[in-house]
A protein has these predicted regions:
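Conserved beta-loop-beta element that borders a ligand/cofactor-binding pocket
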Residues: 147-173
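N-terminal Rossmann NAD(P)H-binding glycine-rich loop of SDR-like oxidoreductase domains
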Residues: 15-39
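Substrate-positioning beta->alpha
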Residues: 177-183, 196-219, 226-227, 240-241
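Rossmann-fold cofactor-recognition segment
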Residues: 55-67, 87-88
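Short-chain dehydrogenase/reductase
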Residues: 124-148, 177-181, 204-205, 236, ...
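NAD(P)-cofactor binding segment of oxidoreductase domains
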Residues: 76-125, 144-149
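Active-site "gating" loop of Rossmann-like NAD(P)-dependent oxidoreductase/epimerase domains
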Residues: 113-138, 152-157, 174
Length: 348
């Protein structure tokens, strides 16, 4: 186990850190920050990401985390002060991680999800002690099951788990609106854009660089073992404002926002339903007191107005990523026409 730190310490001294994944929306920023702070960083994945290349000086090991033999071969006898797992989603995968990393690390950090918190919430703000229950979304239930496996291993085998629950963390490549680039296209074309509910429910969006400040700050801290932490921004915006910030970033003064009940969207598009009903349709306000007590210098400083501009600028500079989803175009046309007419949506 690594040495305890004073509570006021902003970060640990250089540590050996393994990030499983390391090139995703959340993990790439964590990799970059950990390397910038002087940690000895290794990432383990199946290959490079063109969108988020690994920083210079970071060691890359190639193995498929689902193939335990290949991971053991890649790691050999190495130990790490902290292992951060960004790509375990099911209880079987969590159990495999316990098998792989028990005795190999002083801290195993599991990236869960704030969508695991009680839906609908019975009180705000949401705390780490808020019950974990999501009857709408299998993804969230699987994350809850992962946590149960890992905390059982902590209680029964001293497996050094720390659980982190982020909520809607983004980088420049991820558009927060349900329709993604299709919604930007519709705004610029003067077409109506569908917003779930009445657009007034509150949402939090956290830039991956802000997330990384808190996340890297808890790596290598023994006092975090056996604990769970929410990591989000403290900015809460209604969905109407989120859509308008994207419109402004896209050069559209006033988008036509048409409101459609989340249940109606879910009935018309089963693939969108779980995420809408199990996450986005509920107002969320998170209390970050616990992570700030552990990492006192953590403050999310990137407002989403800046994030929206960064996202649109990146897509404008990368035309190959400007992919229109024709199914979503058709769904939006159908449901916005219905919403404005008051008639039953055809086929809905």
């Amino acid at each position: 186990m690594v040495s305890p730190l004073a509570p006021e310490a902003a970060t640990v001294a250089p540590r050996s850190i393994l990030l499983v994944g390391g090139t995703g929306v959340i993990s790439a920023a964590a990799t970059e920050r950990a390397a910038a702070l002087g940690h000895r960083v290794t990432v383990l994945n199946r290959g490079q990401s063109a969108a988020r290349p690994v920083p210079d000086g970071v060691e890359v090991l190639h193995a498929d985390i689902r193939n335990r033999a290949s991971v053991r071969e890649a790691l050999g006898t190495r130990r790490f002060d902290a292992v951060a797992d960004f790509i375990s989603y099911t209880p079987d995968q969590a159990a495999a991680a316990v098998d792989l990393f028990a005795g190999r690390t002083g801290q195993y950090v599991f990236i869960s999800s704030a969508s695991a918190y009680q839906k609908p919430p019975t009180r705000l703000p949401i705390l780490e002690s808020t019950p974990l229950k999501n009857p709408f979304w299998q993804y969230s239930r699987d994350k809850i099951a992962c946590e149960e496996v890992l905390f059982a291993a902590y209680r029964e085998r001293d497996f050094p788990v720390t659980v982190v629950r982020p909520s809607h963390t983004y980088d420049r490549t991820k558009i927060a609106m349900v329709g993604g680039w299709t919604d930007i296209h519709r705004m610029r074309a003067g077409l109506p854009v569908m917003v779930h509910g009445d657009g007034t429910s509150l949402w939090t969006l956290t830039h991956s660089k802000d997330f990384a400040k808190a996340f890297v700050g808890l790596l290598g801290r023994p006092q975090a073992v056996g604990e769970s932490y929410t990591i989000t921004s403290d900015e809460y915006l209604p969905w109407n404002q989120i859509y308008r910030l994207f419109a402004r970033a896209a050069g559209v003064a006033e988008p036509e926002l048409v409101h459609v009940a989340s249940e109606t969207i879910a009935a018309a598009s089963p693939e969108l339903g779980p995420n809408l009903l199990g996450d986005r349709s509920h107002s969320v306000v998170f209390d970050n007191t616990k992570i700030k007590a552990l990492v006192p210098d953590y403050t999310a400083t990137i407002p989403f107005a800046d994030g929206a501009r960064e996202i649109v600028a990146w897509f404008d500079a990368n035309p190959a990523s400007q992919v229109l989803n024709q199914d979503y175009m058709d769904l939006t046309d159908r449901l916005t026409t219905w919403a404005r007419s008051g008639q039953r949506p055809a086929g809905g």
